[in-house]
């Protein structure tokens, strides 16, 4: 029985990466931009109905809800060649169209005001599913709509559908650039609190690392949003391959997350992908790829889509790893590669659990040609991700100490009387950092926030 997934795209960034994701899915399943199955798409071994449903005339419609408080990005989607793909009733645009002004508080309170309309769409979409498994939410944590309204929707979703899984693809800001959003540290910490409390799994898409990969690995001097979003859509489509081309394991969202997330709070995942190749690279630069080569490269920090401390010199370690390997793969090669990785101690694992690298070998789309014999995506739970949260906390503390740029927050009802919500959010993220650090120790199974607090006291 297919387990359907509803995708929510929130804000400018969420809708842009969502758009690239659907373009990619259409390509992989042989669906034309207007939702009609291509004549050549006769394979029939894929599960389109996890992410699409069929209209009365049999054309495919994404199980997607597009939400924004300003119209530009959604208008671009609706005037693109893919405009007929979407269900127009699943598009929510704020009537005043003024956006959230990159302010989390504004996005959150606007979410509250329009919740009825938004959840009418979501309820209708959920009721139309035979066996809904969960929701995927695409957004950014730094702006106003994706972070603020995204946080509001996340809270309500987890209350309204407590038995359904919520996975997010969350874009973290580029730390190498000076942001034009001065309140970005506040937005990030407030959103991280909701991602910690309300999501079951968060795939971290770190703009710092994505830009670094585009420049260093793909040799693109100044990467455009489209090029970065292409990278993101590759990660999103590969991370859902086992759901769309099912095999005997990891063929639903719960199976996928259960192997990666052993304890509820440690649910922030990083990804790595290899081999990377840009559009401008020629066929001559294609090298030989083997299973061992791909699995070894996936463990290298430079192929990680997160700029966190993952090197073996640090105390940080892997909690779990799932490698999704595609192409010409002999299962015996997988076994040999795992043995080699273990012998050479190429991956440093937690001391309190099994050192397991799981490997999934889903089929590739027969409609998309790859230049490489073998390619792989790693989804990893790694304690080094806490360095990303520490960076966010340091930037937050710098602003909060001076109470800088808080006027726009105080205009919203949540912050009118006091700023407690900001401090609670900071404590939540700080506790998350402590838990990831505790996970590097052998006594982690006995760890609890209360014990940690009493030590500090």
Curated annotation (Swiss-Prot):
<dbReference type="InterPro" id="IPR017975">
    <property type="entry name" value="Tubulin_CS"/>
</dbReference>
<keyword id="KW-0206">Cytoskeleton</keyword>
<keyword id="KW-0131">Cell cycle</keyword>
<protein>
    <recommendedName>
        <fullName>Tubulin gamma-2 chain</fullName>
    </recommendedName>
</protein>
<dbReference type="InterPro" id="IPR002454">
    <property type="entry name" value="Gamma_tubulin"/>
</dbReference>
<dbReference type="GO" id="GO:0090221">
    <property type="term" value="P:mitotic spindle-templated microtubule nucleation"/>
</dbReference>
<dbReference type="InterPro" id="IPR003008">
    <property type="entry name" value="Tubulin_FtsZ_GTPase"/>
</dbReference>
<dbReference type="GO" id="GO:0000212">
    <property type="term" value="P:meiotic spindle organization"/>
</dbReference>
<dbReference type="InterPro" id="IPR037103">
    <property type="entry name" value="Tubulin/FtsZ-like_C"/>
</dbReference>
<dbReference type="GO" id="GO:0007020">
    <property type="term" value="P:microtubule nucleation"/>
</dbReference>
<keyword id="KW-0547">Nucleotide-binding</keyword>
<keyword id="KW-0963">Cytoplasm</keyword>
<dbReference type="InterPro" id="IPR036525">
    <property type="entry name" value="Tubulin/FtsZ_GTPase_sf"/>
</dbReference>
<dbReference type="GO" id="GO:0005874">
    <property type="term" value="C:microtubule"/>
</dbReference>
<dbReference type="GO" id="GO:0051301">
    <property type="term" value="P:cell division"/>
</dbReference>
<keyword id="KW-0132">Cell division</keyword>
<dbReference type="GO" id="GO:0007312">
    <property type="term" value="P:oocyte nucleus migration involved in oocyte dorsal/ventral axis specification"/>
</dbReference>
<dbReference type="GO" id="GO:0007057">
    <property type="term" value="P:spindle assembly involved in female meiosis I"/>
</dbReference>
<dbReference type="GO" id="GO:0072687">
    <property type="term" value="C:meiotic spindle"/>
</dbReference>
<dbReference type="InterPro" id="IPR023123">
    <property type="entry name" value="Tubulin_C"/>
</dbReference>
<dbReference type="GO" id="GO:0000278">
    <property type="term" value="P:mitotic cell cycle"/>
</dbReference>
<dbReference type="GO" id="GO:0007052">
    <property type="term" value="P:mitotic spindle organization"/>
</dbReference>
<dbReference type="InterPro" id="IPR000217">
    <property type="entry name" value="Tubulin"/>
</dbReference>
<dbReference type="GO" id="GO:0051316">
    <property type="term" value="P:attachment of meiotic spindle microtubules to kinetochore"/>
</dbReference>
<comment type="subunit">
    <text>Interacts with Ote.</text>
</comment>
<dbReference type="GO" id="GO:0005737">
    <property type="term" value="C:cytoplasm"/>
</dbReference>
<dbReference type="Pfam" id="PF00091">
    <property type="entry name" value="Tubulin"/>
</dbReference>
<keyword id="KW-0469">Meiosis</keyword>
<dbReference type="GO" id="GO:0140490">
    <property type="term" value="F:microtubule nucleator activity"/>
</dbReference>
<keyword id="KW-0498">Mitosis</keyword>
<dbReference type="GO" id="GO:0005813">
    <property type="term" value="C:centrosome"/>
</dbReference>
<dbReference type="GO" id="GO:0000070">
    <property type="term" value="P:mitotic sister chromatid segregation"/>
</dbReference>
<dbReference type="Pfam" id="PF03953">
    <property type="entry name" value="Tubulin_C"/>
</dbReference>
<comment type="similarity">
    <text>Belongs to the tubulin family.</text>
</comment>
<dbReference type="InterPro" id="IPR008280">
    <property type="entry name" value="Tub_FtsZ_C"/>
</dbReference>
<dbReference type="GO" id="GO:0005525">
    <property type="term" value="F:GTP binding"/>
</dbReference>
<dbReference type="InterPro" id="IPR018316">
    <property type="entry name" value="Tubulin/FtsZ_2-layer-sand-dom"/>
</dbReference>
<dbReference type="GO" id="GO:0005819">
    <property type="term" value="C:spindle"/>
</dbReference>
<dbReference type="GO" id="GO:0005634">
    <property type="term" value="C:nucleus"/>
</dbReference>
<dbReference type="GO" id="GO:0031122">
    <property type="term" value="P:cytoplasmic microtubule organization"/>
</dbReference>
<keyword id="KW-0493">Microtubule</keyword>
<feature type="binding site">
    <location>
        <begin position="142"/>
        <end position="148"/>
    </location>
    <ligand>
        <name>GTP</name>
    </ligand>
</feature>
């Amino acid at each position: 029985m297919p387990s359907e997934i509803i995708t929510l795209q929130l804000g400018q960034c969420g809708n842009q990466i969502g758009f690239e994701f659907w373009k990619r899915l259409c390509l992989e399943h042989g669906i034309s931009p207007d939702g009609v199955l291509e004549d050549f798409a006769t394979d029939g071994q894929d599960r389109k109905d996890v992410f699409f449903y069929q209209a009365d005339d049999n054309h495919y419609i994404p199980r997607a809800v597009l939400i924004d408080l300003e119209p530009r990005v959604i208008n671009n989607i609706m005037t693109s060649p893919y405009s007929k793909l979407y269900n127009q009733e699943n598009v929510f645009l704020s009537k005043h169209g003024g956006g959230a002004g990159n302010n989390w508080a504004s996005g959150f309170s606007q979410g509250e005001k329009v919740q009825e309309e938004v959840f009418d769409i979501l309820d209708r979409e959920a009721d139309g599913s035979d066996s809904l498994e969960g929701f995927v939410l695409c957004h950014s944590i730094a702006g106003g709509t994706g972070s603020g309204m995204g946080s509001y929707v996340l809270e309500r979703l987890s209350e309204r559908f407590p038995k359904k899984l919520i996975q997010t693809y969350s874009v973290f800001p580029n730390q190498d650039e000076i942001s034009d959003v001065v309140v970005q540290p506040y937005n990030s910490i407030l959103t991280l609190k909701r991602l910690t409390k309300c999501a079951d799994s968060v795939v971290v898409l770190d703009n710092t690392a994505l830009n670094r990969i585009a420049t260093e690995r793909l040799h693109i001097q100044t990467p455009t949003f489209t090029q970065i979003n292409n990278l993101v859509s590759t990660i999103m489509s590969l991370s859902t391959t086992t759901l769309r081309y099912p095999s005997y394991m990891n063929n639903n969202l719960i199976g996928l997350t259960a192997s990666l997330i052993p304890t509820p709070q440690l649910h922030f995942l990083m990804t790595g992908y290899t081999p990377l190749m840009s559009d401008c690279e020629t066929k001559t630069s294609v090298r030989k790829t083997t299973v061992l080569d791909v699995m070894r490269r996936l463990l290298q920090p430079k192929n990680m889509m997160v700029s966190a401390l993952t090197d073996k010199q640090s105390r940080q370690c892997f909690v779990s790893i799932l490698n999704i390997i595609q192409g010409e793969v002999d299962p015996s090669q997988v076994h040999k590669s795992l043995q080699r990785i273990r012998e050479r101690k190429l991956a440093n694992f937690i001391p309190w659990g099994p050192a397991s690298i799981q490997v999934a070998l889903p089929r590739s789309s027969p409609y998309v040609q790859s230049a490489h014999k073998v390619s792989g995506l790693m989804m990893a739970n790694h304690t080094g991700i806490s360095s990303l949260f520490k960076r966010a906390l340091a930037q937050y503390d710098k602003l909060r100490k001076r109470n800088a740029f808080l006027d726009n927050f105080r205009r919203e009802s949540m912050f009118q009387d006091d700023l407690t919500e900001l401090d609670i959010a900071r404590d939540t993220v700080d506790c998350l950092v402590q838990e990831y650090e505790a996970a590097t120790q052998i006594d982690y199974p006995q760890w609890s926030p209360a014990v940690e607090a009493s030590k500090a006291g």
